[in-house]
Amino acid sequence: MITLRPSEARGHGKLDWLDSYFSFSFSHYYDPAHMNFSNLRVINEDYIAPGQGFATHGHKDMEIVTYVLEGELEHKDSIGNGSIIRPGDVQRMSAGTGILHSEFNPSPDQPVHLLQIWITPNQFGVEPSYEQKFFSPEDKQGQLRLVASPDGRNGSVTIHQDACIYASVLGQGETVSYSLSNRRAWLQIIRGNLTLNGKTLKTGDGAGINEEQAITCTGQGEATEFLLFDLP
């Protein structure tokens, strides 16, 4: 069964410096029908204005993944990390026993566009940690590139959950298939259009996938980018 989550049905929040679209309940947006999907708790699409960002704040017991689409994001945290996250980078922060961090757009004139992803961990009270890795467009072209996994295999970042995240870019007519067996999956379109087992999805759409043995995605345009979450 494939349940579509259209882009326009997402929650929306707007501040002077931040424009956000929520796939699941977050902040002031509450929808009991869309609290999470398996261990996937948050997919927020954020646009952060130049020279603005999230001031220092804390998290505990959450796996937080940031996927920058356009612009740059400056990260600082309480365990000594400081970095710039650019398109192609995947940032993973395990909050564990507690971590403070800030995320700031350092550009004076360019917004930053990103996906913020939260996954509920299968271990609580772990030592906070941070990881960041780059995946080129060629890594993702015409295939499912593993970018996050429980064991960090194939150069992916490591998360504390029985879940994997794949990134892909498909050209017109390019196809990728994935076997699910008895697992669930979520697909999130970043840009472009594709068909998922015959169903059409567009930019910003998501899809919850249950009780499907396999899925096939086919690009409908020059460069369709998406994330696939393999979930318990």
Swiss-Prot record:
UniProt enzyme class: oxidoreductase
Binding site residues for a divalent metal cation: H57, H59, H101, E103
The keyword Protease belongs to this UniProt entry's keyword annotation: no
Cofactor note: Binds 1 divalent metal cation.
Catalyzed chemical reaction(s): quercetin + O2 = 2-(3,4-dihydroxybenzoyloxy)-4,6-dihydroxybenzoate + CO
Keyword Metal-binding: yes
Cofactor (UniProt): a divalent metal cation
Enzyme Commission numbers on file: 1.13.11.24
One function term, GO molecular function aspect: metal ion binding
Keywords (A to Z) from UniProt: Dioxygenase, Metal-binding, Oxidoreductase
Pathway: Flavonoid metabolism; quercetin degradation
Pfam families for this protein: Pirin (PF02678), Pirin_C_2 (PF17954)
Protein family according to the UniProt entry: Belongs to the pirin family.
Function: Putative quercetin 2,3-dioxygenase.
Protein name: Putative quercetin 2,3-dioxygenase sll1773
Organism, as annotated: Synechocystis sp. (strain ATCC 27184 / PCC 6803 / Kazusa)
